[in-house]
Amino acid sequence: MSIRRILVTGGAGFIGSHLCDRLIEDDVELLVIDNYYTGSLSNVSHLTDNKKFKIINHDVSDPFDTEVDEIFNLACPASPVHYQKDPVRTTKTSVQGAINMLELANRVGARILQASTSEVYGDPEVHPQTESYWGRVNPTGPRACYDEGKRCAETLFFDFYRQYLLEIKVARIFNTYGPKMNINDGRVISNIIVQALKGINITIYGDGKQSRSFCYISDMVDGLIGLMKTKKEIIGPVNLGNTNETTILELANMVIELTRSKSRISFVPLPEDDPTQRCPDTRLANKILDWQPKVSLEDGLIKTINYYRSVL
């Protein structure tokens, strides 16, 4: 029986590197392409001596050719700090990157999974968000480069499925956190933890009453691998995330308590188009993947705090 060859785009990033850690445990050959725009070689440096692992510096928006059995398409900056820095590049990564990987998958007969996002729901009017909800996204706002880029990538995946009968899987990833998030990541959990550990004011946008649900990285990786392994007929989209909702202010107070920080909270204006609520309906994932998150927010925060202590 031949060894499975797996390609992970964005494999040096936060979620991608954790996915690689899990995949390499099986009898596979693992190829990663990453341009290190937000990813870092240090995230996978412990794998580079493994003969089953190879990483190539490559931008997914440029064509790429190889022979693989499976593709996890994760490449794209996911934090507003990064994706708004070069919005044209962000859109190109999502759209042209999807086209390149879909054409590769179609050419070699590979199964391909798209790492989509809860951002396709925008600032939702339906709560919690089900996969059948079409979303409420501002197509011309400062977040559109990411939100609409991911929505277009989903469109391309389903068009390749309908037109070429390509084996696709689409996962909609909700807020995910854990070790290996960059200290300058810019997202809420990394911001709050880093500020708390430094003892500086913790920045809260708006009044802090906006809510999110946070999924620990190991649970997310379980979901992604589980979805890739499902039978051909299951294509998605499938929500992956934690259904336990918390406000940003509650999160900040929890981090202050866990870090024993003397930081105070500083309220600043809410960014444009920032969602007021974000929480997944995961009944579909529960049913078809037999999946649900196992790590509580407190336990996940403790692990993440310990990681940041080690790198600050």
Question: Can you say where each PLM-predicted feature lies in the sequence?
Answer:
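Conserved C-terminal active-site "lid" loop/helix of NAD(P)H-dependent oxidoreductases
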Residues: 217, 237, 269-292, 303
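N-terminal Rossmann-like NAD(P)+-binding domain of SDR-like oxidoreductases, especially those catalyzing
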Residues: 1-176, 196, 218, 303, ...
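Glycine/proline-rich active-site loop of Rossmann-fold NAD(P)-dependent oxidoreductases
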Residues: 125, 151, 167, 176-191, ...
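Hydrophobic "lid"/C-terminal helical patch
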Residues: 19, 224-228, 252-255, 301-308
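A short C-terminal helix-loop "cap" of Rossmann-like NAD(P)-dependent dehydrogenase/epimerase domains
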Residues: 53, 131-137, 164, 193-204, ...
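Residue-level signal for the nucleotide or nucleotide-sugar donor/cofactor binding architecture
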Residues: 39, 85, 93-96, 144, ...
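Residues in well-ordered alpha-helical elements
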Residues: 69, 81, 88, 99, ...
